[in-house]
Amino acid sequence: MTETFQHISVLLNESIDGLAIKPDGIYIDGTFGRGGHSRTILSKLGPNGRLYSIDRDPQAIAEAGKIDDPRFTIIHGPFSGMAQYAEEYDLVGKVDGVLLDLGVSSPQLDDAERGFSFMKDGPLDMRMDPTSGIPVSQWLMEADLDDITWVIREFGEDKHARRIARAIVEYRENEENEPMVRTGQLAKLISEAAPKSFKEKKHPATRAFQAFRIYINSELEEIDTALKGAARILAPEGRLSVISFHSLEDRMVKRFIRKESKGPEVPHGIPLTEAQIKELGSANMKTVGKAIKPSKQEIDMNPRSRSSVLRIAEKL
């Protein structure tokens, strides 16, 4: 029997409002998930509007198959391929809005078989697309101490990174231990490795699990490529609406929008003519409003929305 997992779209109205949807516009939802944002966009489009949604999770693609609408197209792949897909559909410079809802969806977290959560025991996998790449369990068996430490520190911002990495390496080198292939095994190991002085409200494994997930899915590289792709394919006055869920993601989005809003930097001390400065280009986007966070009411209804941040930009 297949278990059904509910997903509540975070900052749904705010992110859709940020797109300033035109009834006959062309839109891209880079993260279909379970379709909350896509269905809302479709409800605001007229007969000539178009929505292209992207996801690399086969379960999301199956969910998208339930939408029978000639205005809707689902694309199976990573959102980093957005610019490529836009070229294939002749959409470059014609897209009126791009939505990116970053991170893991609730169904992915709640389905123990996907291996994303330390709260439910399941196979130690964590791949967004289980048909490609390697599971976390395999990487942890092969990576050296320094690599594991770097991943936990870089992507989990965990000050106990070395201690956790050492515990993982020592565990796998002990031939008496069972192979570490379950999320429960890893969560228990990290909890035991945490110092007795650990006082954070979060579970000791929270940051390490986030780090492994980000690394195994190349999430930050995916986001960087997707943001650049979105800036390229948007039409003038097209909107970019991005929801992030942790500080690493939000910093990337904030810096990207700031950089695109400033335009290229003119090198100091190098005399340039006005024509040469013009050749360097100008600002590509502008920030729309301030960063938006969920209301207390939304957080009460959906505690997972607590860390979310929405940023909106417009193509010039």
UniProtKB/Swiss-Prot annotation:
Gene3D superfamilies per the UniProt record, alphabetical: Putative methyltransferase TM0872, insert domain, Vaccinia Virus protein VP39
MF annotations from Gene Ontology: rRNA (cytosine-N4-)-methyltransferase activity
Record has Methyltransferase as a keyword: yes
Class of this enzyme: transferase
Entry GO CC: cytoplasm
SUPFAM superfamilies: Putative methyltransferase TM0872, insert domain, S-adenosyl-L-methionine-dependent methyltransferases
Binding site for S-adenosyl-L-methionine: 35-37, 55, 79, 101, 108
InterPro entries: RsmH (IPR002903), SAM-dep_MeTrfase_MraW_recog (IPR023397), SAM-dependent_MTases_sf (IPR029063)
Compartment(s) where it occurs, according to its Swiss-Prot or TrEMBL record: Cytoplasm
UniProt entry keywords in alphabetical sequence: Cytoplasm, Methyltransferase, rRNA processing, S-adenosyl-L-methionine, Transferase
Pfam families in UniProt: Methyltransf_5 (PF01795)
Reaction(s) catalysed by this chain's protein: cytidine(1402) in 16S rRNA + S-adenosyl-L-methionine = N(4)-methylcytidine(1402) in 16S rRNA + S-adenosyl-L-homocysteine + H(+)
EC number: 2.1.1.199
GO biological process, one term: rRNA base methylation
Keyword Manganese: no
Function: Specifically methylates the N4 position of cytidine in position 1402 (C1402) of 16S rRNA.
Assigned protein family: Belongs to the methyltransferase superfamily. RsmH family.
UniProt xrefs under NCBIfam families: 16S rRNA (cytosine(1402)-N(4))-methyltransferase RsmH
Name of the featured protein: Ribosomal RNA small subunit methyltransferase H
Taxonomic path: Bacteria, Pseudomonadati, Pseudomonadota, Gammaproteobacteria, Vibrionales
